[in-house]
């Protein structure tokens, strides 16, 4: 198969990502188990300045970018989350339903806490699946990095294209 191009900004273009600091986890006990192996997973807002990992069919609010192992706030580990309004995200289709260009996606079940979503180099990708009902507000498939939309395809998803 021919080499695929990757959807990237034009040379010299500055497209900022929207990165924010959040407390991590549904509760302090869960937060204590989060490690750098969880980077790349899809997250949702669950409280005041707090996110937790998405489960199947959740709306994706962002992607975990970093975990501060020695910094806490209110008993929770702290990390950086890239907001879903940032330009582009890498994702892996982990559900049996295929996707096509511009299909909307939601979270699929992420790997267990402390376990990467995949093997390198695909371990920092969100696990996604096709949304059952489109609403025009979700991340959309804008490029296939590998595969053609079947299970295991690596995708580029975005809210600003399509």
Kindly label every feature range from the protein language model.
Residues 1-162:
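Surface-exposed, low-hydrophobicity beta-strand/loop segments enriched in small/polar/acidic residues
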């Amino acid at each position: 198969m021919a080499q695929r191009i990757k959807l990237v900004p034009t040379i010299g273009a500055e497209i900022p990502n929207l990165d924010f600091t959040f407390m991590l986890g549904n509760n302090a006990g869960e937060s204590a188990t989060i490690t750098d192996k969880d980077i790349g997973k899809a997250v949702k807002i669950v409280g005041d300045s707090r996110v937790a990992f998405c489960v199947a069919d959740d709306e994706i609010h962002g992607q975990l970018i970093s975990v501060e192992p020695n910094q806490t706030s209110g008993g929770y580990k702290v990390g950086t989350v890239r907001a879903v309004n940032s330009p582009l995200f890498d994702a892996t289709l982990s559900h049996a339903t295929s996707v096509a260009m511009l299909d909307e996606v939601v979270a699929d079940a992420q790997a267990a806490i402390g376990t990467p979503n995949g093997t390198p180099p695909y371990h920092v990708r969100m696990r996604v699946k096709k949304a059952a009902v489109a609403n025009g507000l979700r991340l959309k498939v804008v490029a296939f990095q590998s595969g053609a939309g079947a299970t295991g395809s690596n995708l580029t998803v975005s809210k600003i294209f399509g």
